[in-house]
Regions:
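Amphipathic, small/basic residue-rich leader segments at the start of a protein or domain
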Residues: 1-124, 148
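Structural beta-strand/beta-sheet cores of well-ordered domains, especially the beta-sheet scaffolds
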Residues: 11, 123, 133, 156-160, ...
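Flexible loop/turn segments at secondary-structure boundaries
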Residues: 99-103, 132-136, 144-145, 168-172, ...
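Short glycine/proline-enriched turns and hinge-like loops at secondary-structure junctions
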Residues: 104-106, 172-174, 201-207
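Short, conserved phosphate-binding/catalytic loop or strand-edge motifs used
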Residues: 109-110, 128-134
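Internal maturation/activation junctions in enzymes
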Residues: 126-130, 141-183
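A short core secondary-structure module
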Residues: 187, 191-220
Length: 220
């Protein structure tokens, strides 16, 4: 089995020598992210990816998930790896501090995410979709929605996914037929069919928040 080794030397060179990450983070209001802190994060990230995720890559591919009685079971070791991912603070890296996150710039998290994609892409798909759902809620959600969902999603207690694909359309959102009809109480009635949702079901988190992308019906 090929062992994964995080390219820490290359990452340090890009961050420190090419991008001047210390000045970059300071401009973003995070002058606490010194070169020493960045290196420490990279080193701990490498340990997690090399020691926890990479060993599950081949076994996860060979075993795959199982679907029985409406329940999805991830490959052996995935649920425990996800628990460690959350407990070690990796899930909350870029989450807003107001909702329990660490408030790291995405540029700080990017090297760790690259490690994950190299060590175990299947595992990264689950966490990456949560990142997307958190970003969408943070940008467009009401204060009530943010307060309800973001703390648990940022901590990793809940995961998220994005429901785009329909039976007749993949990533071409112009072809969507799922509809969202405004209701008198301010909510929307959604009708339509979504399929092939990456990360749409798993046994690693307590809850899964599924964001659906519909076509909004205009009120005449």
């Amino acid at each position: 089995m090929t062992a994964y080794k995080a390219p820490l030397q290359d990452m340090r060179f890009i961050l420190h020598d090419v991008l001047d990450s210390t000045a970059h983070f300071a401009r973003l209001g995070r002058d606490d992210l010194t070169a020493e802190i960045v290196d420490a994060v990279l080193e701990e990230g490498a340990k997690f990816n090399e020691g926890v995720l990479a060993p599950l890559n081949r076994s996860g591919d060979e075993e795959g998930i199982t679907f029985k009685d409406g329940e999805v079971t991830t490959p052996e070791g995935f649920a425990d790896a996800y628990r460690q991912f959350c407990e070690n603070g990796w899930a909350s890296m870029t989450g807003g501090e107001d909702f329990g996150g660490q408030g790291f710039p995405v540029s700080m998290a990017a090297p760790f995410q690259e490690m994950m994609m190299s060590a175990n892409l299947s595992f990264r798909v689950y966490t990456g979709l949560t990142d997307g759902a958190v970003f969408a809620l943070n940008m467009h959600g009401t204060d009530e929605l943010k307060t309800t969902y973001l703390p648990k999603m940022i901590s990793g207690e809940w995961t998220g996914t994005m429901c785009l694909t329909e039976p007749h359309a993949g990533t071409d959102l112009a072809l969507l037929r799922t509809k969202a009809e405004p209701q008198a109480d301010g909510s929307y009635a959604i009708s339509g069919t979504k399929i092939f949702i990456s990360g749409g079901e798993q046994d690693m988190s307590e809850n899964i928040i599924r964001l659906r992308i519909p076509r909004q019906c205009r009120e005449d």
